[in-house]
Amino acid sequence: MKKRSKDLLSVKKLDHEAMEIIQDNTIDIYPWETTYIAANNLNWKPRPVFQSYITYTPYLDMKNANFYNSVKSPSLILWEKKHWGGEVESIDGRYLLNDEPLTLFQILNHYRPVYENPSFLLMRRADYELLSQPTIVLQGVYQWNAWLNVPNNRTSTNHILRAKTNIKRTSSQKLKKLLYKEFEVY
C-alpha cells in the first residue's frame, strides 16, 4: 500500500524549476488537484472551498473570492492545466471558468504567471491589483438565437470583458431546476 501511494504521488512531482520558485512560500492549487501538496511537501494555504467543482452557489464563490482578495491569500497558485475534459472543462461537462466566476476574477486581478509547463501554470501574487475597475459597456434585453455584437476590448492590457446575464425561466424550467438541475445554456 505504501509503495502504491508513493507511485501515485510521484506522478505529481514538480520539476526543479517550479520548486525553486515555490520554495516554502504559501500556495493553493486550482482547480482541485491537491495531490501536488503531498507529492511535493508544499506549504498549502487553501481557499475556504478548496475544490472548485463544489463551489456551486454564489455564497461559496464569494467566500473563495474574498479569500483571494485578502491578506490571507497564498503567495502562489498552481493552476493545473491537465485534468479530465481538457484545460477548461469541469465535472459534468461544465465550463471550468463558470464554476466560480467571482473567484476567477480575483485570481486574475491579483496573480500573474511566473512559470508554465505543459501540466500547470504557476502564478505569483502581485503587490497591486492587475485589472482595471469593472465598467458597464453594454446592457440591454436580447433575444435567444440572435447574434450580439461584442464591444472591442483591445484598448488596454488590464481590461477583461465579462458578461453578466439574467435569464428568465419558464415555470417548467423552474420546476426542473428545483427537482433536478439547471437547463443547459450555450
Regions found by a protein language model. Name each.
Residues 1-130, 167-186:
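Extracytoplasmic
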Residues 124-177:
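Solvent-exposed, flexible loop/coil segments flanking beta-strands in beta-rich domains
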